[in-house]
Design a protein with these regions (language model features):
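Terminal low-complexity, poorly structured segments
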Residues: 9-11, 15, 628, 637
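N-terminal secretory signal peptides and thylakoid transit peptides that target proteins
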Residues: 1-11
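Hydrophobic membrane-targeting alpha-helices
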Residues: 14, 18-22
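N-terminal pro-sequences and low-complexity stem/linker regions of secreted or lumenal proteins
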Residues: 24-667
Length: 667
């Protein structure tokens, strides 16, 4: 009874609070236009306030008429503030849509950090410089495109956001959590090593348009979302699953309470998902002889349960759902928790929706040495559909799972179906053979990943992949009917000042949903040019957009998911356990990114050429010669402010240890 009483005590707190305390939520338009840009961009800008006033339903009908393809370019592990914290016009570290922030206005801006001598100091956000000067006067390059990964476990992230007694995130424990230190009466529990202190500094860092000019170019030309949150407080796998399910398994937890987890990596066989286990399908536990799914060469974190709650791949089956699920190899194992969902989807009268999940290394890639797939770049715990038996254990459903090379081949050959939803992911290494700028030969094989995950991916290699994907779409007939959504699974545990709104808690009473802020952009011929959307959004908003465009029943309205939610209300005092594509306040959709005049045909759509980045620029590292802000004509909001880089800062404390300014450090 004690655990349930805890959940009742905290479950209703925080909702409706903390969402926009820096942003002034509810006091500004959904979309504003960023400060003046180049002539190329300015010529395509219309003040959002001058758009025709139409109802949400009228706008949705226009979107349905124009958009037939939704592409989700799904990257890894960056906070919004890390990439866009100094983007003009957004709710950033130094300024918001209305101008600079006053001291103390940004949550967690100044954080405690313990020095290696045990004294207490502070750290504030800073931009990672391209170079520093060491004690001998030598210029030392830091290569900010290659940084270590900080702690993004469920427990660590819950500590970092630091809820107060009212359930409002203070975002004040990022540095101390990285150090592994707590303060008791102002005194540290232990003295951190140099490496741990450097991680405490790294978590507060950010970059700008000099490091990721392609990302800023897309934000400049199309629509950036400055309040898009991840769904689960925690790592990649639960948030990959949330991208297609709107939850991490809470309804499965409610239907099977003995499956609850208290968190911690290695405890994979539990729901809701809170760690990064490998999918059950393809693991050593999967003894089925049919449809053996691939596993990554590098595995950790145990093995997941078979996930049995509803997701978009189930909804995508549409009116053919009974015929499709009849092909499942083990329906008693895969389908018991969605029987009523299947009936409702079957009776909805909507045809099956085409879809595809394209992920590097899932099958043979173009850089594999022979006809056999090596799966060398495959990160299995990023492949959300592989966790669901009704996909991975069904010969019809698995035809929707592909490798990354397949995406480029299918788009170039015009082999996509007449409409649909398509997810695209990178992984370890990259199929183009791009090398990070850092000349260290060891790091060339450590940071050559293309999915943007710190610790193994290079930021510019990763934005190069995005550019190749967008170019492929823009060069195809699909461009004129497309909505391209770039977003991330989670924040990697990097500092972000926007307060997540906590609506649910796990079995241990730790915050479960929603998590920290992450980048999100919409690119489309019908997008608001140079816009910043301030609509509260998250992974479920992408699902909601897909629901709306393809007239699907929201996952939250399916009967088995409703049953799980009702158990959460009745037995655990929590109202919002389950999908958030409906019935959860404060979760908007992605429609604010679309220009009404363009949708109505009264203003020219944005051209494919406007979206394309030339191949020669993609292949030239560093992008824009490391001078992206000047090339783009953008002045970051920290321009002219002191950049308080800690004297012992190191962007890669684990792979290139030491102090760059001390002399003798190898990047």
């Amino acid at each position: 009874m004690g655990r349930r009483m805890l959940l009742i005590a905290v479950g209703g707190l925080g909702l409706g609070r903390g969402l926009g305390q820096e942003m002034g939520a509810g006091t500004k338009p959904d979309v504003t236009i960023a400060p003046k840009s180049t002539a190329v961009v300015s010529a395509r800008v219309i003040d959002a306030a001058n758009e025709p006033a139409i109802s949400a339903q009228e706008k949705l009908q226009l979107i349905r008429r124009r958009i037939k393809y939704v592409f989700v370019l799904f990257q890894e592990n960056r906070s919004f503030d890390f990439y866009f914290g100094s983007y003009p016009g957004a709710d950033g570290l130094y300024a918001g849509p209305s101008g600079p922030y006053a001291s103390g206005q940004v949550a967690g801006f100044t954080q405690a950090i313990v020095n290696t001598d045990g004294t207490l100091g502070t750290v504030t956000p800073f931009r990672i410089p391209a170079t520093v000067t060491d004690t001998a006067g030598k210029t030392v390059p830091l290569y900010p495109a290659d940084i270590a990964s900080v702690n993004h476990s469920h427990v660590a992230t819950a500590r970092k956001i630091a809820l107060d007694a009212d359930g409002v995130a203070q975002n004040s424990e990022y540095a101390l959590t990285e150090e592994g230190v707590t303060l008791v009466d102002g005194k540290p529990s232990k003295v951190p090593t140099l490496e741990r202190k450097q991680f405490g500094e790294l978590v507060m860092s950010h970059v700008d348009c000099d490091t990721v000019p392609f990302l800023w170019r897309y934000a400049d030309r199309f629509t950036l979302f400055d309040h898009f949150m991840d769904t689960i407080v925690g790592p990649s796998t639960p948030n990959a699953i949330a991208m297609i399910a709107g939850q991490g398994g809470e309804t499965q937890w409610m239907l099977h309470p003995d499956a609850a987890t208290t968190g911690g990596i290695g405890m994979g066989a539990t729901v809701p998902m809170l760690s990064d286990p490998q999918p059950y399908w393809g693991s050593a536990l999967d003894t089925a002889q049919q449809l053996k799914q691939p596993q990554a060469l590098h595995t950790f974190g145990g093995v997941s349960k078979n996930l049995t709650f509803a997701s978009l791949p189930l909804s995508f089956m549409g009116s053919t759902i009974k015929k499709t699920t009849a092909r499942d190899y083990d329906p008693a194992f895969d389908l018991p928790d969605v029987q009523e969902d299947i009936e409702k989807i079957a009776g909805h009268g909507v045809s099956a929706v085409n879809w595809g999940w394209y992920q590097q290394g899932y099958d043979r890639e173009k850089n594999d040495p022979d006809a056999k797939a090596t799966h060398d770049g495959y990160v299995a715990h990023h492949n959300a559909p592989q966790y669901f038996g009704y996909v991975a254990n069904n010969p019809v459903a698995t035809t929707h799972l592909h490798g990354l090379s397949d995406f480029f081949r299918d788009v170039a050959a015009k082999q996509l179906p007449a409409s649909g939803v398509f997810y695209v992911r990178g992984g370890y290494g990259n199929i183009e053979g791009w090398k990070p700028q850092d000349p260290n030969p060891r790091l060339a094989t450590v940071f050559n990943g293309n999915d943007d995950h710190p610790g193994y991916s290079d930021s510019q290699v990763s934005e190069a992949l995005l550019a190749e994907e967008i170019n492929a779409i823009a060069s195809s007939p699909y461009w004129s009917q497309s909505a391209i959504i770039i977003t991330y699974d989670e924040s990697d545990g990097e500092y972000d000042h926007a307060r997540p709104r906590i609506r649910s808690y796990d079995a241990a009473g730790l915050p479960l949903e929603q998590g920290p802020r992450i980048p999100a952009l919409v690119i489309s011929p019908y997008a608001v040019a140079h816009g910043v959307s301030h609509v509260p959004t998250e992974h479920s908003s992408v699902i909601r957009f897909v629901d709306e465009v393809f007239t699907l029943i929201p996952l939250a309205d399916l009967p088995d998911e409703e049953r799980g939610r009702e158990i959460g209300k009745k037995d655990f005092g929590q109202d919002y356990l389950g999908p958030a594509d409906d019935k959860v306040p404060g979760v908007g959709d992605m429609s604010s990114a679309f220009d009404v005049l363009r949708l109505q045909g009264k203003r020219a759509p944005l051209s494919a050429a406007y979206a394309i980045i030339p191949k020669r620029e993609i292949d030239a590292f560093p992008h824009d010669h490391g001078d992206g802000c000047r090339v783009l004509g953008i002045t970051p909001t920290d321009s002219g402010l002191p950049n308080p880089v800690p004297s012992d800062f190191n962007p890669r404390p684990d792979s290139t240890p030491g102090i760059p300014t001390a002399g003798g450090w190898t990047p």
